[in-house]
């Protein structure tokens, strides 16, 4: 396990506990001061702080919420979701969940169709794993949690240390595709242990996301108008009537979007309008406390696929605290309530009253490369 790999390094670290506390108080509030000066609840987590600094400086361009953050978050999902208890119960290998297989078997798994383009972040992360004594399985989830923390408005995600690396390649076909219908997506996600509402919660990740390969003529095309902030614009803008493609038409898994420069995945469009998921989708619009809470819950669940939490070490306090975001959701300039395609009319989840941004019609710029 990664904990075993790190243990020798951890034992070499200086650690102190505050003196003058009662035994009971110390048991409840024990903090360890690492050799690097930071404090944490568990000595084993001290080894993560140098890795954190390296990631922020050399992978995320000085703690930015940019392309490499988007891709690292995508990798957390693609690595973990290749997990099928149904296959396991049928006597086949169903994948190891969050086991680093995408990096361990980087000559094979990134070539699966659903993983198109993920080889770039895989290759970017490999040198960090090579120079730090951490498993690929842990690094993928650690980098994803750190990356999310760079985005204003995001929740502080959990991180658990100690995942062993994969020993087998998961079967192809376990990662949902943007051209899959809702029934297929919900079935696949259900096999992995996620309910319909949890699928919607996971898609909060698309508020800080962009596509390079759905339409290769326009790399870096974001899924909402604010790809560097973790907000509810994605859920709002996916409910707006599509009017045009940001690049070329006819790409598999893409439908018309409401804004120039914004991409809309077919799967997002369908989930926002399907009777099984539309009300939960609508409930996320302008509801940041809910988005933050639910995304934290579901990302924890994703990161533990294939593992028992009791076997891992909680190092969540190593993850930086994201900046807060106070701006409410608004219609992009040129859009209003008249552009919303409402499917859910449940009294419990009414569509909120929102203002429209002033100025000319919104055009969304691409996410610049790292």
From Swiss-Prot:
Sequence positions that bind heme b: 206, 210-214
CDD domains assigned to the protein according to its UniProt record, in alphabetical order: ligninase
SUPFAM superfamilies reported in the protein's UniProt record: Heme-dependent peroxidases
Cited Gene3D superfamilies: 1.10.520.10, Peroxidase, domain 2
Keywords of the record: Calcium, Disulfide bond, Glycoprotein, Heme, Hydrogen peroxide, Iron, Lignin degradation, Manganese, Metal-binding, Organic radical, Oxidoreductase, Peroxidase, Secreted, Signal, Zymogen
Pfam families: peroxidase, Peroxidase_ext
Position of the signal peptide: 1-20
Subcellular location: Secreted
GO cellular component: extracellular region
Cofactor-binding details, from the entry: Binds 1 heme b (iron(II)-protoporphyrin IX) group per subunit. Binds 2 calcium ions per subunit.
Cofactor(s) needed: heme b; Ca(2+)
Binding positions for Ca(2+) 1 per the UniProt entry: 79, 97, 99, 101
Annotated residues for binding of Ca(2+) 2: 207, 224, 226, 229, 231
Location of the active site: 78, 201
Keyword DNA-binding: no
Similarity field: Belongs to the peroxidase family. Ligninase subfamily.
Protein name: Versatile peroxidase VPS1
Lineage: Eukaryota, Fungi, Dikarya, Basidiomycota, Agaricomycotina
């Amino acid at each position: 396990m990664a904990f075993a790999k790190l243990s020798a390094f951890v034992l070499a670290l200086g650690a102190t506990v505050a003196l003058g506390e009662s035994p009971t108080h110390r048991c409840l509030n024990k903090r360890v001061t690492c050799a690097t000066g930071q404090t944490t609840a568990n000595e084993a987590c001290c080894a993560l702080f140098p890795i954190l600094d390296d990631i922020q400086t050399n992978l995320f361009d000085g703690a930015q919420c940019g392309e490499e953050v988007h891709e690292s978050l995508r990798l957390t999902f693609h690595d973990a979701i290749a997990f099928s208890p149904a296959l396991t119960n049928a006597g086949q290998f169903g994948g190891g969940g969050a086991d680093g297989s995408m990096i361990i078997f980087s000559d094979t798994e990134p070539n699966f169709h659903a993983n198109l383009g993920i080889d770039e972040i895989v290759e970017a992360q490999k040198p960090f794993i090579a120079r730090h004594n951490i498993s690929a399985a842990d690094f993928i989830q650690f980098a994803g949690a750190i990356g999310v923390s760079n985005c204003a408005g995001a929740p502080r995600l959990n991180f658990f240390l100690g995942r062993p690396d994969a020993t087998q390649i998961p079967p192809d076909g376990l990662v949902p595709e943007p051209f899959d219908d809702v029934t297929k997506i919900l079935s696949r996600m259900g096999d992995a242990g996620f309910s319909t509402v949890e699928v919607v919660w996971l898609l909060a990740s698309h508020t800080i996301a962009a596509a390079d390969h759905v339409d290769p003529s326009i790399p870096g095309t974001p899924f909402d108008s604010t790809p560097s902030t973790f907000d509810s614009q994605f859920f709002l803008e996916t409910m707006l009537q599509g009017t045009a493609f940001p690049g070329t038409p006819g790409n598999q898994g893409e439908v018309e979007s409401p804004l120039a420069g914004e991409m809309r995945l077919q799967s997002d469009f369908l989930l926002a309008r399907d009777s099984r998921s539309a009300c939960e989708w609508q409930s996320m619009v302008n509801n940041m406390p809910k988005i933050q809470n639910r995304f934290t819950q579901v990302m924890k669940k994703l990161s533990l696929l294939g593992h028992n939490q009791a076997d891992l070490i909680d190092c969540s306090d190593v993850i930086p605290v994201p900046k807060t975001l106070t701006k409410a959701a608004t219609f992009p300039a040129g859009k209003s309530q008249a552009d919303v395609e409402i499917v859910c009319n449940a009294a419990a989840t009414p569509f909120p009253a929102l203002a429209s941004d002033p100025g000319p019609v919104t055009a969304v710029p691409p996410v610049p490369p790292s």
